[in-house]
């Protein structure tokens, strides 16, 4: 099992606690992935971080549930062997009460290929008490 998936390991999203140490998955994004109905992400950045963790853990159910219905694909297929290497949140902008943007860089590596960076500015909307990923522009 990869270290990022071990119980007690730091959250794959890389968020740091007040002590400057990585938060455990259960105290960070795990609470959103494992209790979707009862614990919605409080802001667009938290949702984006939890969606990154859902990619790391191949949680298509969470990714689809947090994708806005206007843009949601019918299914998600994960590329076999992809290793997610890290996430850097560059900016979180609250545009108004129901719209936000998050700029981030996620790194991944596929078997037999060099590592790649996904640089995206994602758009989010808040509806019915939840944040949803709408779409994004890659750079």
From Swiss-Prot:
Q: Which domain of life is it from?
A: Bacteria
Q: Which HAMAP family match?
A: UPF0225
For this protein, the parts annotated as crossing the membrane are none
The name on file for this protein is: UPF0225 protein Bpro_4182
Query: What does the similarity note say?
Result: Belongs to the UPF0225 family.
Question: Which Pfam families does this one have?
Answer: YchJ_M-like
**InterPro entries according to UniProt:** NTF2-like_dom_sf (IPR032710), UPF0225 (IPR023006), YchJ-like_M (IPR048469)
Gene3D superfamilies reported in the protein's UniProt record: 3.10.450.50
Q: Which organism is it from?
A: Polaromonas sp. (strain JS666 / ATCC BAA-500)
């Amino acid at each position: 099992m990869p270290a990022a998936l071990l119980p007690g390991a730091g959250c794959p999203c890389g968020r740091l606690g007040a002590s400057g140490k990585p938060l455990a998955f259960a105290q960070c994004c795990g609470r959103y992935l494992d209790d979707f109905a009862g614990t919605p992400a409080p802001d667009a950045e938290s949702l984006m971080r939890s969606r990154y963790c859902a990619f790391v853990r191949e949680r298509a159910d969470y990714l689809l549930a947090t994708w806005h219905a206007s843009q949601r694909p019918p299914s998600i297929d994960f590329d076999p062997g992809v290793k997610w290497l890290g996430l850097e949140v560059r900016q979180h902008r609250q545009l108004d009460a129901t719209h936000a943007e998050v700029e981030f860089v996620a790194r991944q590596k596929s078997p037999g290929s060099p590592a790649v960076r996904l640089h995206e500015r994602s758009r989010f909307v808040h509806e019915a008490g939840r944040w949803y990923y709408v779409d994004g522009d890659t750079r």
